[in-house]
C-alpha cells in the first residue's frame, strides 16, 4: 500500500542549494520517508524505525564510506 506523503513536512540539509538533494519526512508511526528533491512526484522509500536506526548506525560507524584507490 502506498501512503500519500504530499502533505508531509520534508526537510533537507542546509548545505543543499539545488534540486539534487535527499529529502526526509518523519511519519507519525515512527517510520521515515526518503525522496529525491528533483523527482518529488515519484514514490518515496519508506523505512520502519528499526531499518532507519540500522542505517543511521551504519553511517556513524563508517559502513558506507567509500575507499579511494
What are these regions, as identified by a protein language model?
Residues 1-69:
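Positively charged, low-complexity terminal tracts
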Amino acid at each position: 500500500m502506498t501512503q500519500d506523503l504530499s502533505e508531509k513536512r520534508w526537510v533537507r540539509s542546509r548545505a543543499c542549494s539545488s534540486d539534487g538533494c535527499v529529502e526526509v519526512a518523519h511519519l507519525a508511526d515512527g517510520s521515515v520517508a526518503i525522496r529525491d528533491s528533483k523527482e518529488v512526484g515519484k514514490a518515496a522509500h519508506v523505512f520502519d524505525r528499526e531499518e532507519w536506526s540500522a542505517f543511521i548506525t551504519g553511517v556513524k560507524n563508517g559502513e558506507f564510506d567509500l575507499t579511494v584507490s
